[in-house]
Structures are given as structure tokens and as C-alpha cells.
Swiss-Prot record:
The keyword Nucleotidyltransferase applies. The lineage of its organism: Bacteria, Bacillati, Actinomycetota, Actinomycetes, Mycobacteriales. It comes from Corynebacterium aurimucosum (strain ATCC 700975 / DSM 44827 / CIP 107346 / CN-1). This is DNA-directed RNA polymerase subunit beta'. Zn(2+) 2 binds at C902, C979, C986, C989. HAMAP family: RNApol_bact_RpoC. DNA-dependent RNA polymerase catalyzes the transcription of DNA into RNA using the four ribonucleoside triphosphates as substrates. One of its GO terms (biological process) is DNA-templated transcription.
Length: 1331
């Protein structure tokens, strides 16, 4: 086998018959496969050993030569080469066709390449190929011109002969008539009889005359056709063509079928045709010019690539190796065979029959019919079903052709090349492993033994437990006791990778240190669940084993769970306490103000009678008080603390030089909060507040913010240790808090019936107005009832909320953010409220009961509509979201960080801060998703002109606050949208990696990270289109809206946008508006006609007439002023319009804002840079308007960076540069237009992409990831980029000793908190290790 690393590009082209014969090891002449008795391949058949190689290693077919010593010998008896049977996967054969056939891809594909080349309509081409019409292939015009007068004279003579014959025949008939009449008269016949004879004779003479005229007309037609005969002329009438051949075969050639096409192609002058087409393009217009452009594309492709167009017509077809179309014996003695064998057999059968008929000299009509059948059988082999009805096998199933083997999810590309099943893997159900550290997982003993079998066997032999590998294998299979000890050794410090399907983002596969566990289930760390989106209700996970030292090192350094705490999409922590852990930490840090034990130990200020109570000299004393039973966790106390850093305000006040460990300070806190702070690093400022997961206000603190802050200030290993401590503490205190839910914890509102009475009356009033008085429309009734019952639900819900005491477990679970929300408590204890039907509209009767009371039958029925719709929606959404992710990955897969800095000074402006009060500033609400993690593009100066931030500085939160406090609210930052790196992006334009908080590494596959970050939350987005109540129809939202934006589609309710600044005037045209903008600059008015009133005019913010300081939202009116790019109607603008009016930057901003609006509505945080990467790919190409003196074709799409280089070269040579128009392409179109044909073919429309690539002889430079995965090369990302290849690292002795000296944390009340012998820290190397 050849080495994939030996080449840097892959080219595809058209194979000629010579190429096919050169690849082939022999001709397949018989349709036989294998002998049913001997089960040996038939000679010259589809499995022939002489052609394809031996079926058994080192053995010829007849058995004369056996064993490897005869390697390379060709047996003189059977003709089989003695070699490995593996060659049957590589060796090809061929079938010599008795008549040429066209390749169906090139004639039937859209557009028809053969049709464009020969300037024939596909319909005509089909007639010729399938023997329904003749075509003239060449005309000897000179000979025809020279002999024309002679031939004409001959034709006139022939016509005269015909006329003379007719006259003679008529005269003869007239004479016979005379004779007949005379005889009748002599016999005394009546006048009637004479008239009959006369009429019959007249009729007959008329027929003779007409026949003569027809014959003359036919001769005229033949002559006129011959005189005008030109190449590529089609003659459908078979008789005329035969006459032409009989009379004038020396002056022209013609024919039907692929032979005629082949002759035309061989006579075709590509260069002359190209010149002619260029002439038409330069001077022509309209349809003619468009067709010439399309034809020139095909002609130029053949000229440029050097492909021989004759390759589109085949004289021989290849037969793929037999191992790729196997035939296997089933249990019952029958055979299962690949469909290809059936298709090949049809071809061979028809080909052999055609040969026989030609040899026998069969009539032409029979031969042509056989040729047509041969053409059809080759079509079926190449692409079954492309033309006409597909060839079917048993059970009416269409047979899978060569094209079908490549296409679709089950095709070669997606099934076997982009995703393979691998060895050293297993899968099992997952269960929770609360005792594990973050970097560990529990691996069942049996599974581990099977996975690590080779390693265990090797060690058994090394440690002298077994003599050889065979006995070691037996020991492992019998599970001897010593095997387990050796297994422990084998798995130590050998990470495994866990994966849960669907792998929606890169954290769906992470590395863990295995720990052996009993049972058969994999144990997963509770904090890793969020990233995997795993729960323990029967989920399964797959285990993979990294084998090589490099793979293990990467798994450990890059993929270990404790190194992947932050989300690559937003930079927020994913490994965060949740559910029970949150409840535990909430319980631990609550401040009851009252002591749950008895009150003696809590803090009480001094009174006249007694001194201060509840003041402790140390944390230890407070714990002792708790052990004695006088102090509760949540009681307020005062305590002297010296082992934890004070909060920043106390530190600033009491320790102006900075606090040192051991210095004491007095804290007013609770014992639980000290315990919580004990979990954090000792030098982290003391946190005084209740820990919650969401809804942090007042003295509540968000756990996420704490972990975010830790991740920013401490190394990952410290954060991982803290998270593990939090997990242990969370579970420990959740257990001890006794928080559970029982039915009795659900308190029912006692006065609900009275509360609902008034609403019932109001509902009756609305119904009466509609039914009896007719005072309301159907829509008004619906809106009022919905509003009324929503208000009722809120009233009941709020009453329920107030009724619950703080220590009730249900509000505790909700308020801590562990699970659920208040709305769910309302449905449990208040009322369910309004529910939707299957269309998504509200049912106007609410569900008045709660789940605690139970629903009535009707209520249950009403409720089931919405529930079912929810389930159906989720299923559809999952599929749609997966497809969106796939398209995003495909469009961005080749965006990799290629260099440190592209050197551009360009950037985009982002909002940094807002003025909250005069002179007081704060960070902008969108700072986290737009400005954070960027690099400053230009020097930022304050109002005095002093530089606050230099260009190239990382924009941290601290620096952002400094800039904002200086009054600078918007700055220019580097962005991938303005990056000048040709293929990929540079690190400075990308900024920080959200997952690490550091500047992104060179080689990072940021395109795929972006696609996953956008696609992964896709399932959370809704499928609903939002109703606008009356006007304007529906607004598309959720997932459909995101798809609409990324596909750059014309939106459903398209809103026109103002193309100039100016004043609006409206004129009413019945159902439509006509809107005119009078531009401010005095240019011509811009008129927008037929604007639907149903859609409604755009909403604008304008000052109130009564109070100009206040702003209101109202519809656009006569006399309003609009700016360029403003919407004129409700709905969404078309991205193509935005690009035209506002330019490239305008459409970039529009798309980012619109996509973010959808995700923010669902509470999903995604950084703008991910969306920017996709948009950059959508805007990468432009259309050539004027080619100048370049070789580009007008109307062609071309990469803008490539066009830049071409233009620069032209200008340097003194030529005219090409002019381009920016284009916005949807992600599907952009994926298919990629430079890499391998990537495009594996995405969609495989046959079309391959057809196009072959004609253009496209070379794949193997720049992206997909193309390298397909051919099995190391991907050019991460550690696979060229700069990291062939590195050898040898650690020094000191480095070896220091390899795992790692900080561990001391014991605490939660048991051993040491991180185990391995924690995931990377090996420190000496300074001189430069890569």
C-alpha cells in the first residue's frame, strides 16, 4: 500500500479507455462468478483469479505452487500469480465494449456537460444516444459544392423520370378505361354501371398523380436536406436518412448512438470554439450571451485541464476489485452478492450478445437495439435510476450502482471514510460515581480487562507470570487472580476516552483516568454530565483507548476532563455543581437568622444583663460548638479567622499592605459559610452570601460567577480541586439537609375557588358579548380570554408563592437554582393555566386544577394536545438541529488558526460600555459575547489624548473597565471578518480561545469549534413561528430563523429597506401602499410599489407630539425621515438587499445581530466570534462582472483572496484587473463551492461535484480537515500541523523526577481529598525545549 503522507494534493480527472486498460490486469469476458460446486472463481469471469489474484495467500488456482517461497511466480498451468490474496482488493479488470457508450454523468447530469460542449439540447442528445435519431458528424462541403450541378442534374432527371412514369401510367389507365367503357356499351349496360367504372378509373388516376407528386416532393426534400446538410444536424426521419446514405454517402458521414457522439467529439476543435464563444460574449446580449457563457465554462474547463473530452464516451469500462463487491455463502447454501455483480453481469451479457450479432452480420435494426440495451446497462451500472426506471433486484428493490455506493449517509464517503468503527473500544450503561475525582471515571473490571488485554498479556510475560504470550492469553481468559494486579498496573496513568452520542460539541468526548470498579456499568463523574448532556436514566457511553504515547499525551494534556472546565462557546464553566450539589451548598450557606438547634450558640449582641454571645475565637472553636450541639450551620456568628483571606473591603481597611496568611480578622458570618469558603483556595477573598445556581440578587451569589472568577485567576488544576471539594460538600450537606419532596410538601391554596370566581364572571361576560351581542370579533374574543386567564394564572401563582415558608423543600430546591422554576410550583399547587392545541394556539378554557388536586377528564384531554405537540416538536427539532450543525461544520471545517498575526490594522467596532448616570459608566450588557477575549485593533486614547490601551493588547475585563471609565464607550477590535490570512485566520484576529482564556494556539480548528458552538444549542431553540396578533402574519423565530439567516434565504415576510436617506411619502392603493422616498441629496426619488397592507408598515421610535422628550413606538407615517438601511415594512430584510444597500460590513452586522437575537431569546450565550467565522465563509466569494485582461470568466464565482492575487499579478504586468461584485452565499451553497472537491463531494450532491471536478481536473490541496480525514492523513490542526511533526522530546533527569510533583489538598471532613497520584498536570520541560 502507498503511504498517504507522501503526497500533498489529490487530483481527479477523466479516465480515457487507454487509462482503463492500463489499470486493468485482464479482460473480464464471461458473466460467471463462482462455480456453485467447487466454489472456485470461474476463469475469465467476474471473480477470475488470473485477473484479480489468488483467493488464498501464496497459492495458485490449480495448487501447483503453494507457500511463500514461490512468491511472484505466475503458474504456467492456470496463469495465476503466487502472491497475497489481499491484491484482490486492489487489482482491477476491464470489459472491452463492442460499441462505445456515453458516461451517464456527463450527459444526464444538470447541466448536461456533453450538451454544452456539442451545443445540443439534452433532449436531442438523448434521442441520438438511445438510437431514436441520426446525427450528421461531418460533411465534405468542397466535394458537394464541386459536384452540385451534376448531382442536381441527376436529381432533375430522376424527377423527370418519375413524372414521365406517372404520365405513362395515367395514359395506360385512360386507355384501359376507354376499352372498358366500349365493352360496357356493346353489352348495353346501364348509365349507372358506366358511371361507376368511370369514377373508379378517375380515382385510380388521381392516386397515381398524388403518388407521383409525393415522390417528387420526397426527392425535393432529400435534395434540399442534402444541400443544407451540416455537422451536428439531427435527422429524425429514418427513411430520409437511409435515402441520403444510399445516394450521397460519399459526401457526408453520420450515425446514431454513442459512436456518432464519439466522432463529433473527436472532430471538435476546442480552441476555435472557445474563440467563437468569447466573441459572442463580448458582442452578444440576452439569452444568447448567457448560453455562450455557460458553454464557455465547459469548453474552457477542457482546455485548461488538458482532459480529453473523448473520455466522456467509453470504449472500455473498468471492473472494480472483487473484494469490494464480494459474494459470500449463507447458511442455507445460498449466496449473498453485491448488487454490482448483477449490474456487471447485465453489461457482460449484452456486450457478448452484441459481439455475436456483429460477427453474424445481423440486420442493423437488431444491432442498434442491442447497442441501446448495452448503453442502458452501463448507465445502470454507473448510476441506476438516473434515466428511466431503475433496474430492480429481488423484491422490486432498485440495485445499488457505483454512484449509490458514494452517495448519502450510507455511501462510502460518510459511512466509511469520515467515520469508522475502531478497535480498542467498548460501550456500557453509565451510573453516577460521586466518589471519583473530576479527572477519573470508573471502568468495569471485565471491560478494562478486555480493553487492556494486550498490555496485560505483555506485562504477565515481563513479570514472569507466564512463559509466553499464548499462556498469558489463557491466563487472561481464565481471569486468574494475578491478572487483576497486573491490570491495575496497566491502567495506571493510561487515560481512556469517554464519548456520549450525540457528540454535539468537542466536550462530547473527554479523557479520564480509569479506576477499576465492580459491576458492569461505567461510572461517570457527576460534574462531567453537563458537558456530555448525560443523565443516569439508562444513557450509554462508549470507551476508547488511546494507544500510542502521543495519543496518550494528547488525551492527558488536551482532553482530560479537569482541563475542560469552560465552554468553548461562551467561556462559561460547564463543570459546575448542579441538582443535589446546589441544594447542599445552598443549605450550607443559608443564613436563617435563627439557630435551628436551640439558639445558645448564635450571635446575640450584648445587653445590660449579659455580654455579647456567639463570638468565637477561631473556626475550630465554632466547629466544637457545633459538635456539642449548641451551634447550627446557619446561625449568625462572629468568628476570628486567620486561615482565609478577608473580603476585599475588610482587607483594604484593616490590611493596607495586603493580608498575609496567619493574620486574624473578625468575620460576621455563619459556620456553614466558613465551611464553604474552606473549599476555595486560601488566598481567594472570603465570600459572604448564599450560593445559588441561578437568580443571584441581594446576598445571593452565583456559583457560576465564582467558578468563572477562579478559572480566570487560578490554574485549571486548582479549579478542578475546588470543584471536587464543592461536589463532595454539596452531596454531603444535601444528604444531611433532608431536602426531599413528598406530596405533603405541596401546599394547596385554600381560597383558590374565591380567587377564580371573579375571573369566571369576566369570562362569561366576554363569551356573552361574542355569542349573544356580536360585539366582538372571533380574534378579539380569543385575545381577551387568553389575557384574562393568563392574568388569573399569575394571580393564583403569586398567591401560592407567598404561601410557601422558606424552609419548605420545594421553594428551597427552586430558589437555590437546583431544579425547576416557580412556574412548575404554580402547576403543582396553584393551577395549570392556559394550554395550547396542536396548532400552537391557546385553548380558551384554562386548566383550573393543579397536579396536586388532579385534573378532570376534559382538562386531561386538553392538556394532552400541547404535550404531544411538544414531543413531536422536539423530535423534529433534533433532526433539524443536527442537519444545521452538519452544514455549519462543512462550511467552516477548513478555518484553522494558520499564523500568529496577519498584520492587518482593520477591525470592527464593538460596544464596550454604557453611561448609567452622568459621569458614571458600566460595561455594556453584551460585553461578554461581543468584546471579551478580543485584541484591541488601534491605540485607545482618552479625551486628553493619552493612550489607555495599545493596539495588540488583550481586552480583559479589567482593561475594559479602565477604558469605559475614561469615557470611551465603543472601540475597534480585531475580528476574523477583517483577517487577511488567506486560508484560515490568524491568532490575533481571533483573540482568546473561550475554553482556555488564553490567546488561541496556532493550529486550533476554530471553524469546527464555531460550528459546534452554534449547532449544539440548536435543540434548545423553538420550532414555533410567533403570532403577531392580527397584522403582519407570522414572524419566523427559533431554529427556522437561524437556518434562514445562515442559508441567506429570502425571508418569509420580506421587508424592503431604504436605499437612501430621505423623507417618506405614502399613497394608499387599496390593499397596498406605494411608498416614495425623496432623498436628502436631491437625487431621483426611490419608489417602492405594492407594499402589502396585511404585512403592515415598519414600527419606528419617534418622539411623542405632546412630550418631545418621551419616545414611542408607532407605524411609519407620511413625512417621517428614514436613514439608509431602515426597514420600511414589518418583517425581516433580505440579506442580499442589505449587502447591496449597506455593503459588506452592514450585512455582517445584520446577520450577527439577528442570529444572536434568536439565541439570546432562549438564554443561550454564544460569543460573536463564532458567528463571525461562519459569516466570513458566507462572504468569501464574489462574482466576476468584468474579467479585464485576466483569464477569469464573467459570471463565475471566485474566492476574493484568489481574485486579489490574480488582479495584483495583472496590474504588475500592466493589464486590466477584473471587477468583482461581493456575494453572500448560504452555507450549503458555500460548502459546495469550496476549493476542496473531496470535502464538497462528501457533503451533498456527490455525483454533481465529482462530475464537475473531473472535467476541471481539480486538485485538492488538502488544506481542510475533512479531506485529510477522508484520505487517512493526520489532520492539519492541533498537533497535526506541520510544525509539530517529527519532533523528538527527551526529558532531562530533573524533569523526569519533577514529572508528577503536584499540589494535593489536605484532608477535610469529606474524607480523602487528595487528587490521586495523577492529576493531569503536564510534564515540566527544561527551557531549551523549543518546538
Amino acid at each position: 500500500m502507498f503511504d498517504v503522507n507522501l503526497f500533498d494534493e489529490l487530483r481527479i480527472g477523466l479516465a480515457t479507455a487507454e487509462d482503463i486498460r492500463r489499470w486493468s490486469k485482464g479482460e473480464v469476458k464471461k458473466p460467471e462468478t463462482i462455480n456453485y460446486r467447487t466454489l472456485k472463481p470461474e476463469k475469465d469471469g467476474l471473480f477470475c483469479e488470473r485477473i484479480f489474484g489468488p483467493t488464498r495467500d501464496w497459492e495458485c488456482a490449480c495448487g501447483k505452487y503453494k507457500r511463500v517461497r514461490y512468491k511472484g511466480i505466475i503458474c504456467e498451468r492456470c496463469g495465476v500469480e503466487v502472491t497475497k490474496s489481499k491484491v484482490r482488493r486492489e487489482r482491477m479488470g476491464h470489459i472491452e465494449l463492442a460499441a462505445p457508450v456515453t458516461h451517464i454523468w456527463y450527459f444526464k447530469g444538470v447541466p448536461s456537460r456533453l450538451g454544452y460542449l456539442l451545443d445540443l439540447a439534452p433532449k436531442d442528445l438523448e434521442r441520438i444516444i438511445y438510437f431514436a435519431a441520426n446525427i450528421i458528424t461531418s460533411v465534405d462541403e468542397e466535394a458537394r459544392h464541386n459536384d452540385q450541378s451534376t448531382l442536381e442534374a441527376e436529381m432533375l432527371l430522376e424527377k423527370k423520370d418519375v413524372e414521365d412514369d406517372v404520365e405513362a401510367e395515367i395514359a395506360e389507365r385512360a386507355a384501359k378505361l376507354e376499352q372498358d367503357l366500349a365493352e360496357l356499351e356493346a353489352a348495353g349496360a346501364k348509365a349507372d354501371a358506366r358511371r361507376k367504372v368511370q369514377n373508379a378509373a378517375d380515382k385510380e388516376m388521381q392516386h397515381i398523380r398524388e403518388r407521383g407528386e409525393r415522390e417528387v416532393a420526397r426527392l425535393d426534400e432529400i435534395w434540399n436536406t442534402f444541400i443544407k446538410l451540416a455537422p451536428k444536424q439531427m435527422i429524425i426521419d429514418e427513411t430520409i436518412y437511409e435515402e441520403l446514405v444510399d445516394r450521397y454517402e460519399d459526401y457526408f458521414t453520420g450515425g446514431m448512438g454513442a459512436e456518432a457522439i464519439q466522432t463529433l467529439i473527436r472532430n471538435f476543435d476546442l480552441e476555435a470554439e472557445a474563440e467563437e464563444l468569447k466573441e459572442i460574449i463580448n458582442n452578444g446580449k440576452g439569452q444568447k450571451k448567457m448560453r455562450a457563457l455557460k458553454r464557455l465554462k465547459v469548453v474552457a474547463a477542457f482546455l485548461r485541464s488538458g482532459n480529453d473530452p473523448a473520455g466522456m464516451v467509453l470504449d472500455a469500462i473498468p471492473v472494480i476489485p472483487p473484494e469490494l463487491r464480494p459474494m459470500v455463502q449463507l447458511d442455507g447454501g445460498r449466496f449473498a452478492t453485491s448488487d454490482l455483480n448483477d449490474l456487471y453481469r447485465r453489461v457482460i451479457n449484452r456486450n457478448n450478445r452484441l459481439k455475436r450479432m456483429i460477427d453474424l452480420g445481423a440486420p442493423e435494426i437488431i444491432v442498434n437495439n442491442e447497442k441501446r440495451m448495452l448503453q442502458e446497462s452501463v448507465d445502470a451500472l454507473f448510476d441506476n435510476g438516473r434515466r428511466g426506471r431503475p433496474v430492480t433486484g429481488p423484491g422490486n428493490r432498485p440495485l445499488k450502482s457505483l454512484s449509490d455506493l458514494l452517495k448519502g449517509k450510507q455511501g462510502r464517503f460518510r459511512q466509511n471514510l469520515l467515520g469508522k468503527r475502531v478497535d480498542y473500544s467498548g460501550r456500557s450503561v453509565i451510573i453516577v460515581g460521586p466518589q471519583l475525582k473530576l479527572h477519573e471515571c470508573g471502568l468495569p473490571k471485565l471491560m478494562a480487562l478486555e480493553l487492556f488485554k494486550p498490555f496485560v498479556m505483555k506485562r504477565l510475560v515481563e513479570n514472569d507470570y507466564a512463559q509466553n504470550i499464548k499462556s498469558a492469553k489463557r491466563m487472561v481468559e481464565r481471569q486468574r487472580p494475578e491478572v487483576w494486579d497486573v491490570l491495575e498496573e496497566a491502567i495506571s496513568e493510561h487515560p481512556v476516552m469517554l464519548n456520549r452520542a450525540p457528540t454535539l460539541h468537542r466536550l462530547g468526548i473527554q479523557a479520564f483516568e480509569p479506576k477499576l470498579v465492580e459491576g458492569k456499568a461505567i461510572q461517570l463523574h457527576p460534574l462531567a454530565c453537563e458537558a456530555f448532556n448525560a443523565d443516569f436514566d439508562g444513557d450509554q457511553m462508549a470507551v476508547h483507548l488511546p494507544l500510542s504515547a502521543e495519543a496518550q499525551a494528547e488525551a492527558r494534556v488536551l482532553m482530560l476532563a479537569s482541563n475542560n472546565i469552560l465552554s468553548p462557546a461562551s467561556g462559561k464553566p460547564l463543570a459546575m455543581p448542579r441538582l443535589d450539589m446546589v441544594t447542599g451548598l445552598y443549605y450550607l450557606t443559608m443564613d436563617k437568622g435563627e439557630d435551628e438547634i436551640g439558639g445558645e450558640g448564635r450571635y446575640q449582641p450584648a445587653t445590660e444583663d449579659r455580654p455579647e454571645q456567639g463570638v468565637y475565637s477561631s473556626y475550630a472553636e465554632a466547629i466544637m460548638a457545633r459538635d456539642r450541639g449548641v451551634l447550627g450551620l446557619q446561625a449568625p456568628i462572629k468568628v476570628r479567622i486567620s486561615h482565609l483571606r478577608p473580603p476585599s473591603d475588610i482587607e483594604a481597611e484593616q490590611f493596607p499592605d495586603g493580608w498575609q496568611k496567619g493574620q486574624a480578622w473578625l468575620a460576621e458570618t455563619t459556620l456553614g459559610r466558613i465551611m464553604f469558603n474552606d473549599l476555595l483556595p486560601w488566598n481567594y477573598p472570603y465570600l459572604e452570601g448564599v450560593m445559588v445556581r441561578k437568580g443571584g440578587a441581594g446576598n445571593k451569589m452565583l456559583l457560576g460567577d465564582v467558578i468563572n472568577d477562579l478559572a480566570a485567576k487560578y490554574p485549571m488544576i486548582t479549579v478542578a480541586q475546588v470543584l471536587d471539594k464543592m461536589k463532595d460538600a454539596g452531596f454531603y450537606w444535601a444528604t444531611r439537609s433532608g431536602v426531599t419532596i413528598t406530596m405533603h410538601d405541596v401546599l394547596v391554596l385554600p381560597n383558590k375557588t374565591e380567587v377564580l370566581e371573579s375571573y369566571e364572571k369576566e369570562a362569561e361576560r366576554i363569551e356573552r358579548k361574542y355569542w349573544e351581542q356580536g360585539a366582538l370579533t372571533e380574534r378579539e374574543r380569543y385575545d381577551r380570554l387568553v389575557e384574562l386567564w393568563k392574568d388569573a394564572t399569575d394571580t393564583v401563582g403569586n398567591a401560592v408563592e407567598e404561601m410557601y415558608p422558606d424552609d419548605n423543600p420545594i421553594p428551597m430546591i427552586v430558589k437555590s437554582g437546583a431544579a425547576g422554576n416557580m412556574r412548575q410550583i404554580w402547576t403543582l399547587a396553584g393551577m395549570k393555566g392556559m394550554v395550547v392545541n396542536s396548532k400552537g394556539d391557546y385553548i380558551t378554557r384554562p386548566i383550573k386544577t393543579s397536579f396536586r388536586e388532579g385534573l378532570s377528564v376534559l382538562e386531561y384531554f386538553n392538556n394532552s394536545h400541547g404535550s404531544r405537540k411538544g414531543l413531536a416538536d422536539t423530535a423534529l427539532r433534533t433532526a433539524d438541529s443536527g442537519y444545521l450543525t452538519r452544514r455549519l461544520v462543512d462550511v467552516a471545517q477548513d478555518v484553522i488558526v494558520r499564523e500568529e498575526d496577519c498584520g492587518t490594522r482593520q477591525g470592527v467596532r464593538v460596544p464596550l460600555g454604557i453611561e448609567v448616570a452622568p459621569g458614571s459608566y458600566d460595561l455594556h450588557e453584551l460585553w461578554e459575547t461581543s468584546a471579551s477575549g478580543r485584541v484591541v485593533a488601534n491605540d485607545v486614547k482618552d479625551e486628553n489624548g493619552e493612550v489607555i490601551a495599545e493596539a495588540g493588547t488583550d481586552l480583559t475585563e479589567e482593561l475594559s473597565r479602565t477604558i469605559v471609565n475614561a469615557g470611551v464607550l465603543e472601540i475597534k477590535v480585531r475580528s476574523v471578518l477583517t483577517c487577511q490570512t488567506p486560508a484560515g485566520v490568524c491568532a490575533k484576529c481571533y483573540g482568546k480561545s473561550m475554553a482556555s482564556g488564553q490567546l488561541v494556539d496556532i493550529g486550533e480548528a476554530v471553524g469546527i469549534v464555531a460550528a459546534q458552538s452554534i449547532g449544539e444549542p440548536g435543540t434548545q431553540l423553538t420550532m414555533r413561528t410567533f403570532h403577531q396578533g392580527g397584522v403582519g402574519g407570522d414572524i419566523t423565530g427559533g431554529l427556522p430563523r437561524v437556518q434562514e439567516l445562515f442559508e441567506a434565504r429570502n425571508p418569509k415576510n420580506r421587508a424592503p429597506i431604504a436605499s437612501v436617506d430621505g423623507t417618506v411619502s405614502l399613497s394608499d392603493e387599496g390593499n397596498f401602499w406605494t411608498l416614495t422616498i425623496t432623498p436628502d441629496d436631491g437625487s431621483d426619488n426611490v419608489v417602492y410599489e405594492k407594499l402589502s397592507k396585511r404585512q403592515g408598515l415598519a414600527q419606528v421610535r419617534r418622539p411623542m407630539e405632546s412630550n418631545p422628550d418621551a419616545m414611542i413606538e408607532r407605524s411609519l407615517r407620511d413625512g417621517d425621515h428614514v436613514s439608509t438601511g431602515d426597514r420600511l415594512m414589518r418583517g425581516a430584510p433580505d440579506p442580499h438587499d442589505v449587502l447591496e444597500v449597506l455593503g459588506r460590513r452592514g450585512v455582517e452586522k445584520h446577520l450577527i445581530d439577528e442570529v444572536q437575537a434568536v439565541y439570546r431569546a432562549q438564554g443561550v450565550a454564544i460569543h460573536d466570534k463564532h458567528i463571525e467565522i461562519i459569516i466570513r465563509q458566507m462572504l468569501r466569494r464574489g462574482t466576476v462582472i468584468d474579467a479585464g485582461t485576466t483569464d477569469l470568466l464573467p459570471g463565475n464565482l471566485i474566492d476574493l483572496s484568489e481574485a486579489k492575487q490574480v488582479n495584483a499579478a495583472q496590474v504588475a504586468e500592466g493589464g486590466q484587473p477584473a471587477q468583482l461584485r461581493s456575494e453572500i452565499m448560504g452555507i450549503t451553497k458555500a460548502s459546495l463551492a469550496t476549493e476542496s472537491w473531496l470535502s464538497a463531494a462528501s457533503f451533498q450532491e456527490t455525483t454533481r461535484v465529482l462530475t464537475d471536478a473531473a472535467i476541471n481536473k481539480r486538485s485538492d490541496q488538502l488544506i481542510g480537515l475533512k479531506e485529510n480525514v477522508i484520505i487517512g492523513k493526520l489532520i492539519p490542526a492541533g498537533t497535526g500541523i506541520s510544525r509539530y511533526r517529527n519532533i523528538s522530546v527527551k526529558p532531562t533527569e530533573a524533569a523526569r523526577n519533577a514529572a508528577y510533583s503536584i499540589p494535593t489538598y489536605g484532608d477535610s471532613i469529606y474524607g480523602d481529598d487528595g487528587f490521586g497520584e495523577f492529576t493531569g498536570a503536564s510534564v515540566p520541560l527544561e527551557e531549551d525545549y523549543t518546538f
